[in-house]
């Protein structure tokens, strides 16, 4: 079946590339909410276009509240496999050599905002499903491609959708890297707050613990580490002002074994007299045992297609896996491909588009063999 999948993906590749260009030509940055458009009209229009393309391929489609788009195929089973990703994109930064919303092909590479993060990979998953359908494979379980519209700015779309809908039995999000990710760090924001009239304490705190520090986690007393993830990372420190209160927000990318209560207690130890510490927001870590069916199968799939070691790894990144149960990050970036998604001249090679579609089609097939 693997060779048939590889051949079928090759036949579909020209159409896949053209559809990626079409969807990347749409500006889907979040803008102000409007009636019927919770994350702005631009991303709603992009969602509808993606569903229109999928419908034209013969799939069942559903737009759920202009927040989530569902593409379905297979028997009417209660449980389902899923690929979950997003159509919203980050803002334009830096100087681009091409128009970020005119997908440009040059020397076998596509350039556009969202081509890698995450429109291109999601269309690889859509065409992976199409390849299996074209091969006449009889699906034992329903498969869904789930398009989101708010991953970059809060993941409120999936939090909202899964309040009333069943989580997938198994699946992945193509919004990270290869090989399969078995664990993601948590992401927490803590606030040091104090009255505005005590702002001098804030400046003293900044001078002592934040400014000119090479390692914020060490200077703040939260340099915890474990074998799985390594060291806790305080990655951002920003001043804020809120009415009669001011302070500092710290964002930590923390190992799964590090308790938030323990981190908060450590941060409190260095408070100035009028300061307090509070947890402002948190996304829990994602952790799967490495011998689970999902992780082992995706390791095998990667190794079969790429002919190289596919041992599962961890990541500091954050994806829909934090809010959608039973899915892991899997692709699309290959080894050595870093810092592409949010940068100027975002790119994805056509050969990588083809390889991703092969991997995802084979992943759907192999996961269904054990169900």
List the model feature ranges, each with a label.
Residues 151-152, 156-268, 283:
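Midchain, well-structured core segments that form catalytic/ion-binding scaffolds
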Residues 50, 122-132, 161, 324, ...:
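Buried hydrophobic packing segments
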Residues 273-281:
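Conserved short beta-strand edge segments in small beta-sheet-based binding/regulatory domains
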Residues 8, 301-302, 306-370:
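Zn-dependent metallopeptidase/amidohydrolase metal-coordination segment
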